[in-house]
Design a protein with these regions (language model features):
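Structural signature of hydrophobic alpha-helical transmembrane segments
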Residues: 31-43, 87-104, 146-158, 204-218
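Helix-helix packing/entry segments at the starts of transmembrane helices
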Residues: 13, 36-38, 82, 96-105, ...
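Specific transmembrane alpha-helical segments of multi-pass solute transporters/efflux pumps
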Residues: 15-20, 48, 52-95, 101, ...
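Transmembrane alpha-helices of multi-pass small-molecule transport proteins
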Residues: 29-80, 107, 159-163, 180-198
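Hydrophobic/aromatic residues within transmembrane alpha-helices
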Residues: 26, 35, 39, 88, ...
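Hydrophobic transmembrane alpha-helices of multi-pass small-molecule transport proteins
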Residues: 47, 111, 120-140, 149, ...
Length: 349
């Protein structure tokens, strides 16, 4: 399962990475609110066919246990964060913004430890430190405007950090459902606001391209990220997702012919090393699971998934998703802070 989670995390970074240079181009015909709205409406469009399936569990996102999480996901991740990002993108080159976006990893890690019971080992903390150094190094190449952009994008990353943890803990809802709700609500609100405050007519030729970018970079990318986060934890998934700048920087050089700066080279090397060191080990200790019910993609290959399907045993290697119950169990094995391992570690420190 961890191997699949690593692959989906890397793919989510690739898809999101291409959004930065394309978004900078689209801002020529759309304001920040309009573009943010269209990007998330594209995400909702990508997930729309899935909502007709019986296991979408849309109503579970609005039950008492998930209502506050869902509201936070929409507000911080779907509304506030993209606006701050696009504001920062206006006054800095796309390559630098792509690298700064990895401050989301730092925000996710700190919030995870302080609030969301995310246990981090020394390798993960090293990855966080390297990411901070990469972001600071990039700022040196941008001058004063880089400071303003860096602050705006850091604020966006804090919002996405909150979104990441709330999404990873949204119990009972599939990644596709979370993406659809965030996309349809945040997308509609942002786009309407953008049209109301617009100082010039909307450039209709930019609408379709913005939606297409949203389908891939905000739709499929979010689903892949959520799948990864629910299996190895938000912080570790964010480290994999932080490969996004590699693709954003490359496309920025291709589309905008931005100068190849030494600070970008150093930052990319630091980020690559951060991804490697944070995926070395999982920690191991004796822990107890209480009874739980939720939905996520899984195989029947561990002690957490031994349930039957209509009285029948499912093939161990078959991937599937449905609402299921976990029985209480106490055991010891290597694990990451996934949906099943959000226990406290105070006694171990």
């Amino acid at each position: 399962m961890k191997r699949i989670a690593i692959i989906t995390g890397l793919l989510s970074g690739l898809l999101f990475g291409v959004a930065t240079p394309f978004s900078k181009l689209l801002l020529n015909g759309l304001n920040s609110f309009q573009l943010a709205g269209l990007l998330y409406l594209g995400a909702a469009l990508a997930m729309f066919p899935y909502m007709f399936k019986k296991n979408s569990n849309l109503k579970l996102l609005f039950q008492s246990g998930n209502r506050a999480k869902t509201t936070g996901i929409i507000f911080f991740g779907g509304f506030l964060a993209p606006l701050l990002l696009l504001a920062g993108l206006k006054s800095a080159n796309a390559a630098s913004v792509s690298i700064w976006l990895n401050m989301e990893l730092v925000a996710t890690a700190i919030l995870g430890v302080l609030i969301f019971k995310d246990s981090l080992d020394k390798y993960t903390w090293l990855g966080v430190f390297l990411t901070i150094i990469a972001g600071v190094t990039t700022s040196f190449g941008e001058g004063f405007s880089g400071i303003t952009s860096g602050l705006l994008i850091t604020a966006a990353c804090i919002c996405w950090g909150i979104d990441n943890h709330l999404t990873a803990l949204a119990d009972g809802a599939s990644p596709q459902t979370v993406t659809f709700i965030k996309g349809i609500v945040a997308g509609s609100v942002n786009f309407i606001i953008g049209c109301l405050i617009a100082t010039q007519p909307i450039h209709f030729g930019s609408i379709a391209p913005a939606i297409v970018v949203g389908v891939f970079s905000y739709g499929f990318s979010i689903v892949l990220y959520v799948t990864s986060a629910q299996n190895i934890g938000a912080t570790r998934s964010q480290i994999l997702f932080s490969t996004a700048p590699l693709w954003g920087v490359v496309l920025s050089y291709i589309f905008y012919h931005e100068s190849f700066q030494w600070v970008h080279v150093i930052s990319i090397v630091l980020l690559a090393f951060a991804v490697i060191v944070t995926n070395i080990l999982s920690h191991k200790h004796k822990h107890t699971h209480i009874e739980a019910e939720h939905i996520h993609y899984h195989q029947h290959t561990d002690e957490h998934h031994i349930h039957l399907h209509g009285g029948k045993i499912v093939s161990r290697g078959k991937w599937h998703s449905h609402f299921h119950t976990h029985e209480p169990i106490t055991h010891e094995h290597p694990h990451d802070p996934d949906l099943h391992h959000r226990h406290n570690h105070e006694k171990l420190l």
